[in-house]
Amino acid sequence: MWVQYERIIKDNGAICLFAQTKFFYELIKSNEKLFRYDLVWDKVLVTGFLNANRQPLRRHEQIAIFYKHQPKYNPQMRKGKPLHGKGNIKVEKIKKNNVYDTFYAIPDLRKGSTEKYPTSILKFQKLHSSQMIYPTEKPIELLEYLIKTYTDEDDTVLDNCMGSGTTGVACKNTNRNFIGIEINQKTFEIAKKRLKI
């Protein structure tokens, strides 16, 4: 797998691979040279109810990020609270009553940009099993997030285990080119239908 990935990946390209538990660590060990960091997908919905008496319920999956050289990185900014203001704090008299005398308050000094850089925790709700077309299907929004983070419009994205074609749908939604590979013919037909090929 790595021989082919390293052959086709651009110098500024990123390889994003999903994995869980033991397989995640084996994946990293398979190419420590190119491994850079991991992201954690918080699925919101939990699984593992049959083992709930023996281990915690699971609600995350890891995403291993590999690359040769610093890839394209377009941080997907998120909304947050404004930063706290600097300088002298001015206390304002806001209310007077008979019981507690006078109340004082510090006015809201927060100002500036509310944009925050992304963290390594990505919160995208997993599809309920009744909505899934394919057993390991990812939310389109999660794949759009990764695609927008590591590529620009008109770039090409490869998914060599494309399943039902969710990555292809995300590429269409974000104006990227898509190459998908699937070994199972029945699943491939589902992907073709979703992608209107």
State where each predicted segment sits.
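Core catalytic lobe of class I
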Residues: 1-190
